[in-house]
């Protein structure tokens, strides 16, 4: 059950936007990872060569925005820290790790074998975690 809060809702999350140098490459990476439709017609966003969207099956929309001279975060380097990260639920960490590495992700922290998550970077350098459901 979703908790009910006394304060009125001011806004609804429409999408999460990731800056990158290659909108086609990064939207393709996340499509292979999460499924969904890249650049599904949607009046909320324009689809030009500087922007792409991914409408996932779960209803979450990721957007990818081309930024000239994009400098990705370097987790855990405090000189270029992450601004956010995605936690993505998986049933089998080992199997999911194999898939994301084949897609172009980089393993940043495998952690303790008993730990329920692992940290990766997507092809543009954004950290994300695979978390055991």
PLM region descriptions:
Residues 14-16, 84-85:
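Short active-site oxyanion
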Residues 69-75:
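A short, acidic/glycine-rich surface segment
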Residues 8-11, 17-62, 95-98, 102-110, ...:
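Core segments of cupin and vicinal oxygen chelate
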Residues 77-100:
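Mid-chain, well-packed structural core segment of small domains
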Residues 111, 130-133:
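Short beta->alpha transition motifs characteristic of CBS
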Residues 54-57, 120-123, 133:
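Active-site beta-strand termini and strand-to-loop segments that position acidic
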Residues 1-8:
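Short, Lys/Arg-enriched N-terminal segments with co-localized hydrophobic residues
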